[in-house]
């Protein structure tokens, strides 16, 4: 089995390694971007250092990647407003057709000769514990890994990244909530190679804590904790979801048991057509309800947390009302979970919140229990509240409690989701505003209309894989 595993990894290693021409071309573009940034800095009233960061700087990028990350490091003495002003000035000078995006502060993204370029301002702090913004850590990450990676370990990292991409858990964006490049590199170094990493993962019992430099003292409530060797108060795996940890464990065991190249290849399911959706809904015998609306004008890393919060709020309230949610999901049009292309933004896209009900309809009345009769003050209040209410049955005593049977506000999940009551469930702020602008409710086989635009999402939903 070892020979078979090594043969598979050898093929992937060769495929994932950029050619000499790829390396030279990317570095030529990176050098040109950095030179232009240095020229733009010369016109500013402050000095700054330009550094290349990320996987392309560390030699751990995989063949076909076309991303260049350049940071402009300003003195910590300037204030945040000046950092943003100077950073955007350099960004727009270097990338005149670029656009601004926002994380903790704005930066410029654009394109140079077919390469996606991020030009990000940060503070040139002495060490990562003195950071003033989250991105200030990045140059420290690059230096830390450059000192520890050699050609062989970099190749092992590329294999690991290709595997994580193949099983759909690579990327620290808030849609994926997977493994970042930096986290992947630390894990491969920690265990000494790709196979050793998989063997360790296969036996993990989360929560798992790793501390590469043995200097962390903070406690984190995450399934995987990897103490940042440049900042002992940070968990590098903080974004990583419990589901993605479990997914990695599943496929680590799978690959070790049956080595094959196919696990290293991203494979979106064949999109469902409308007829496929109708057949799936009919076969399951459930009641799916979809809310479709225009996405708010925010970047995906702001959109996805709000979608999850909104789904959680809706599911909790519907469960409380007796409507059993079997499963739920959020879809964003033109978003397959891969990093956004340069022309992909939230504006102009549709969003779907899908809730599938095992129980979608309830009788007209519901049971409402009061306190035990022996809890005199509360029991008396409950009795008096309903005693003269002709719209309820009771109060009567069942066991030791007062009980009434009262009319339900909503007898169907669809009725609730079509009403103003949805705004009382703790929706994400921007999702609430988007719904207030109007939304469409699709029920049962009518959700087949979503196949045009969400076919891959629906295929993944109705035919789920680990």
Swiss-Prot record:
An example Gene Ontology biological process: RNA repair
InterPro entries assigned to the protein according to its UniProt record, in alphabetical order: CAA_C, CCA-adding_arc, CCA_tRNA_nucleotrans_2, NT_2-5OAS_ClassI-CCAase, NT_sf, NuclTrfase_I-like_C, Polymerase_NTP_transf_dom, tRNA_NucTransf2
Positions annotated to bind Mg(2+): 67, 69, 118
Cofactor: Mg(2+)
Catalytic activity: a tRNA precursor + 2 CTP + ATP = a tRNA with a 3' CCA end + 3 diphosphate; a tRNA with a 3' CCA end + 2 CTP + ATP = a tRNA with a 3' CCACCA end + 3 diphosphate
Binding of CTP, residues: 55, 58, 141, 161, 170
KW tRNA processing (keyword) present: yes
CDD domains reported in the protein's UniProt record: NT_2-5OAS_ClassI-CCAase
HAMAP family assigned to the protein according to its UniProt record, in alphabetical order: CCA_arch (MF_01264)
Assembly with partners or alone: Homodimer.
Official protein name in the record: CCA-adding enzyme
